[in-house]
Amino acid sequence: MKQGRYPYQSWRQQWTEKDEEIVLSALKATGTEHLQDRPVDELSGGQRQRAWIAMTLAQDTDIILLDEPTTYLDLTHQIDVLDLLFELNQQQKRTIIMVLHDINLACRYADHIITVRDRGVYRQGKPEEIMTTDLVSHVFDLDCQMTADPIFGTPLCIPYGKGRKI
């Protein structure tokens, strides 16, 4: 996790007490204190994602960019990672920009969604304002029913699947 502080090191200034404090704070925020001495390749998928997020937090930036942070994770770990990112956004006021291909998780966790088609922005805005059956059909080439999530009230995509139209 200490590698997240690498951009702040130079030949004149090596590891400082401030670096140590920032790394410990990142470990605590991600619940990975007990993993700090283990090689990343020995961690489970969920632990590995948390370790990468801790490393990102250790960079101490206002904006965090993530590309598919839930890839290869089972549903429980996907929710754990997204809950963690949500908490970081709420508690530390960090801007988090991420790529997610799961429409339902994007709608549940995002304040703002940007949909992309043909290498350009197709539509953007609050999930409740832009996520429609027409958008999903055009952007993802998927027939679906959009409804409100019964628990969170966010848009929920129920795909029909190819050849299974109602």
Listing of model-derived features with the role each one plays in the protein:
Residues 60:
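Conserved catalytic motifs of ABC-family nucleotide-binding domains
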Residues 13-14, 39-43, 47:
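Conserved ABC ATPase signature
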Residues 78-93:
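Helical segment within the ABC ATPase nucleotide-binding domain
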Residues 64-68:
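Catalytic Walker B motif of ABC-type/P-loop ATPase nucleotide-binding domains
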Residues 17-35:
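Conserved ABC ATPase "signature" region
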Residues 113-126:
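H-loop (His-switch) and adjacent beta-strand-loop-beta switch element
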Residues 133, 139-166:
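ABC ATPase nucleotide-binding domains
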